[in-house]
Amino acid sequence: VNEQVIEKMFLLYAESMADMEGEFKNRDEMEASYAAFLKEFIENPKQMVFVETVEKQWVCGLRAVESEPGKWFFEAVETMPGQRNRGYGKKLIRHVTEFLKGIGAKKIDCIIVKSNLSSIKMHSDCGFKETKEPPVNCWGELEEGRILFRLEI
């Protein structure tokens, strides 16, 4: 992971980063923490970052984590504000799903905030189904106010 990749990730996840800024002393600390997280994340072969590009520009991305053999978890699915409602998120989810299927994935879970209707629709359009299971993320943490969705491949 080089500085250019980290800078592109900051741009891609600008909204999420702004939401997290209050958890740090300042923006520099937050960016340093995120850069360290990203480097560690990518070094793990069971964790991947995927991006969709348009004319060599990153327009959306997601992180995928293999929580157990054949079971993957999508997190941080985000499209840049100026690129939304153009189908890029669906395209990315479908590309990543096909890639993971090719390496043996059987199931993909994701957790979506109950009020994020556009994300719920996007995932549903890609075949994800709402479950009645507790919204536990790939790190084993319960995320209140969210819904667990699953795609059986």
Predicted regions and their residues:
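Acetyl-CoA-dependent GNAT
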Residues: F10-A76, M80-G82, I93, E152
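A short beta-loop-alpha structural element at the N-terminal edge
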Residues: V1-L11
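Conserved catalytic-core motifs of GNAT/GCN5-like acyltransferases
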Residues: I111-I112, S124-R146
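Conserved acetyl-CoA-binding loop-helix of GNAT-fold acetyltransferases
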Residues: T79, N85-E98, K121-D125
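Short amphipathic helical patch at the helix-1/turn junction of helix-turn-helix
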Residues: T79, V113-K114
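Short alpha-helical
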Residues: Q4, P69, L117-S118
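Conserved GNAT acetyl-CoA-binding A-motif
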Residues: L100-I111
